[in-house]
């Protein structure tokens, strides 16, 4: 199992905090956000993590790279660093880690701090984790059918579609399927 963490954004909404440290490395209760994120995911997966691939901006520097690799190693995984030096969207960020896009993987955006109970159906081809929210118009939301399958995904709906907000964590039984679509 792999975890892919796109985190090259500049964190402009959290300035001045992000002037000296990338947003995913801001400590919360003594640990960087990204560290908490990968620990939570590893706990849910209940299987060894082979690799954690971090997609960062080159300007983050060598110290950040070393810190990220150390986070991966604490979980018994290989830490890999990829670069996204131009903001060309989330699909592009994922493709920056194309050499790691094979086999089962979780893609997790490190720009949202959320505490949630995760569950993984490893028989599913893919999973999008969601959380019930009070203001769905502020988020991307999913609409489910009776079998709990996603039938619609709407970004910041003007009218009510659902109160299940996408939290930025996705599982793929074979992430190469996503790679081929990007």
Q: Which residues does each predicted region cover?
A:
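Conserved core of the sugar-phosphate nucleotidyltransferase
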Residues: 113-182
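Glycine-rich, flexible loop/turn motifs
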Residues: 10-13, 21-24, 78, 90, ...
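Short, solvent-exposed amphipathic alpha-helical segments in soluble enzyme
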Residues: 20, 69-71, 122-123, 144
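Short acidic donor-binding/metal-coordinating loop in glycosyltransferase active sites
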Residues: 110
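Conserved N-terminal catalytic core of the sugar/cofactor nucleotidyltransferase
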Residues: 2-8, 13, 19, 26-27, ...
């Amino acid at each position: 199992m792999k975890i892919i963490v796109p985190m090259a954004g500049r964190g402009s909404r959290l300035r001045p905090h992000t002037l000296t440290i990338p947003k995913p490395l801001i400590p919360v209760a003594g640990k960087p956000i990204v560290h908490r994120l990968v620990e939570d995911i590893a706990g849910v997966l209940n299987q060894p993590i082979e690799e954690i691939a971090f997609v960062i901006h080159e300007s983050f520097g060598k110290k950040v790279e070393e810190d990220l690799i150390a986070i991966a190693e604490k979980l018994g995984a290989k830490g890999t660093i990829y670069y996204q030096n131009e903001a060309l969207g989330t699909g592009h960020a994922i493709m920056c880690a194309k050499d790691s896009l094979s086999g089962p993987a979780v893609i997790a955006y490190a720009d949202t701090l959320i505490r949630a109970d995760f569950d993984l159906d490893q028989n599913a081809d893919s999973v999008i984790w969601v959380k019930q929210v009070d203001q769905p118009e502020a988020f991307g939301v999913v609409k489910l059918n009776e079998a709990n399958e996603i039938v619609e995904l709407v970004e910041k709906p003007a009218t009510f579609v659902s109160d299940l907000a996408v939290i930025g964590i996705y599982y793929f039984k074979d992430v190469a399927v996503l790679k081929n679509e990007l």
